[in-house]
Amino acid sequence: YGAQNLLDLCASTGQRCGFIERESSGEIANVADGPINLNNTKVEGVDIVARYLLEADSGTWSFMLSGARLLDLEERSTLPDGSEFVVDKVGTAASREAFPKWRATFQTQWSKGAWSGSYKARYIGDTVEEPSPGDFRKIRTVTYHDVAGGYDFDNGLSIRIGVDNVTDKQPPVSFTNLNINFDINTYDPVGRFFYGRLTWDLDL
């Protein structure tokens, strides 16, 4: 802010007068012109989680559905004249991160005896980016599908194989991410990905 700016704001608008200390005579004793956090972020949302467990002849099944709805995301900045600049980021995308209204995950796991398997769907809602003033561009929704299966041997050895992003979904192009052309913090940077894991429990 600066001491003079604080004095001007107090005199002209009545703002920031609390930063000015006065003597009993009314003369200025001190102006609190130290580091001040003038920006703040307001976030509001709703998270929903539902789980269900099923015991059947075909095995044990578990289901989980979680969803997140972003209701409010405001970034407020105080300008030198004391006015406030507010940016509503719900449903928008920027150079470092996207803020979709909806995110959701569905997962089911199955096990019977030594066998197990799982399926997961990850949903990211659409957003709008503004690469240049007044130029609005929609970024589509993205859903990833992951599958995996495994087997546990009697000697403590376990094997598991899986595929993440089964449909080889590529991250949507983003014009606000000029260096790599997509949002690496929101979307999977790698396409279809195969993996295998072998573990051995020595306690068995």
Placement of each model-derived feature along the sequence:
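Hydrophobic alpha-helical bundle architecture
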Residues: 135-137, 150-151
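C-terminal beta-signal and adjacent terminal beta-strands/loops
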Residues: 71-72, 121-129, 151-204
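Gram-negative outer-membrane beta-barrel transporters
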Residues: 1-131
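Hydrophobic, lipid-facing positions within transmembrane beta-strands of outer-membrane proteins
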Residues: 44-48, 102-106, 143-149, 192-198
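A short, compositionally biased micro-patch
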Residues: 41, 111, 142, 152-154, ...
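Ser/Thr- (and often Asn-) enriched beta-sheet segments in non-cytosolic proteins
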Residues: 60-62, 143, 158
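Short, local alpha-helical segments
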Residues: 130-133, 142-146
